[in-house]
Amino acid sequence: VAIDGLPTFDEWLSLAFSRFRNHTKSNDHFLSFINLTESLYAEIKTTYPETFLLHGDLHHENILRDDAVGWVAIDPKGVIGPKIIECGRFIQNFIEDEIPSATSLGDATDKEIMLILEERLKVFNNVTGFDQHHLAMVTFIDQVLSTCWSMNSGQVVGLRKIKLIKNLLNDV
């Protein structure tokens, strides 16, 4: 699918990562995550070569229930990429909302976070039919991209969630 004026997911990754490499130059550890992300995304594109118009920011707070029309996705970014990419943001966002004792991700234990991620992978596998390992891959890809955007804008960002999601790649 080619739609004039809309970016591709490839472009999102390329722009964010080249900006990080050329300007942010924060740390080698995060660069290793970028390198892994590029490798994982190449595998995703090979496995899922067909592209679609995606929302680009599909997560819990961007899906609302409207009494007149039913469920509505709001705040679309519009990006072209493999369908499976859309799952990553939903899987990795708002984990703390499912942990009763946590008001932020920092309040949750690694085990609690991993249990939520593993459950979400199972649910998305059951609903979409996408392979759990591929779902873990796109979750990692999305988290690294989101973190890169934050770092490129000068925010101080922890790498804990990236490290935990990376562990999923070995577990599923």
Predicted region positions:
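ATP/Mg2+ or Mg2+-diphosphate-binding catalytic cores
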Residues: L145-V172
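Conserved ATP-binding subdomain of kinase catalytic cores across diverse folds
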Residues: V1-D10, L121-H134, T139-L145
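An alpha-helical support segment within catalytic cores of ATP-dependent transferases
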Residues: A2-G56, D66-D67, N126
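Short amphipathic alpha-helical interaction patches enriched in hydrophobic/aromatic residues
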Residues: F20, T24, I95-E98, C148
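Short, well-ordered beta-to-alpha junction loops that form the rim of enzyme active sites
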Residues: G56-L58, F140
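Hydrophobic residue at the +6 position relative to the catalytic HRD Asp in the kinase catalytic loop
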Residues: E61-I63
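Residue-level recognition of alpha-helical structural elements
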Residues: G5, S26-F30, H133, G154-K161
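Active-site Asp-x-Gly
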Residues: D66-K122, N126-H133, M137, V156-L159, ...
